[in-house]
Amino acid sequence: GPDRDEVLGTVRRLYAELVGYPEDVFESGTDLEADLGIDSIKQTEAFARITDHFGIPESAAVDVRLTGYPTVDAVADLVVELAEGRELTGTVA
């Protein structure tokens, strides 16, 4: 699968592009909604761009509840799992 640091960098970049924030606001512990005000609609849009970027099929990501992945680090971990085609655990929020 892809390198996690590379995935994290891409996740941060795509979020930054989508919402118009500088990349450095996306710290590892920063809550996308609570701290940055990025609502679930924007998170879903960002996630679609991210999975598209990494060639992850929509079917693999269809059951993901993004509320369970509130930080860029959590999203990056999820993307690595999906990219490796692992069985997902803990997707139900």
Please tell me what each predicted stretch does:
Residues 1-93:
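4′-phosphopantetheine-dependent carrier domains
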